Amino acid sequence: MNKDLTRGPVMRSMLLFAVPMILGNLLQQCYNVADTLIVSWYLGPNALAAVGSSFTLMTFLTSVLLGLCMGSGAVFSIRFGQRDADGLRESARASFVLIAALTVLLNVLAFLCLDGIRLFLRVSDDAIWALMREYLAVIFCGIAGTFLYNYVSCYLRAIGDSISPLIFLAVSALLNIGLDLWF
């Protein structure tokens, strides 16, 4: 479901395009708060400290992936606006391969550098580090999903669809909270 944002009233088109992205950001904040509450209620202060200590690293990795996906999205939107279907397909294919390879590389480096990460993040408590290491291992296993969501979302937004990424995010948030409670 794509929408030609070059037709019709500009303000209306921009608002209709932006509202799902704003709602998506609010939804992400809600499930981050839910994660924090669930961890603190069920796993205790050390687990909460482990998750909190991981935040800087996870923000960095996610920002790198998101930046690459958004840059690709700019190229996609240019190709889409030019009505260059072949160029759009080629851009999508090339950027997917590049970002997927970088995602794998970042993941491998993160796994290999876990002890260095501990020093960099200055986590001195062994109990917190043990929980943090376990948490990061799970997160690193899911980084491919983060890449796929961000990549597909940027592609869809580039062709005018900001609703589908919101739906994907809503389903993901509900699954995340449900799995948090289950495990």
Where are these regions (language model features)?
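Short alpha-helical transmembrane segments in multi-pass integral membrane proteins
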Residues: 1-18, 76-142, 178
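Residue-level signal for short hydrophobic patches within transmembrane helices
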Residues: 7, 11-30, 34, 57, ...
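Helix-loop interface residues and adjacent transmembrane-helix termini in multi-pass membrane transporters
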Residues: 18, 30-33, 42-45, 79-82, ...
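Residue-level recognition of transmembrane alpha-helices
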Residues: 18, 25, 52-55, 99, ...
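Interfacial/gating helices of multi-pass transporter permease domains
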Residues: 39-59, 127-131
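Small-residue-rich hydrophobic transmembrane alpha-helices
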Residues: 48-108, 146-165
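Alpha-helical transmembrane segments of multi-pass membrane transporters
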Residues: 110, 163-183
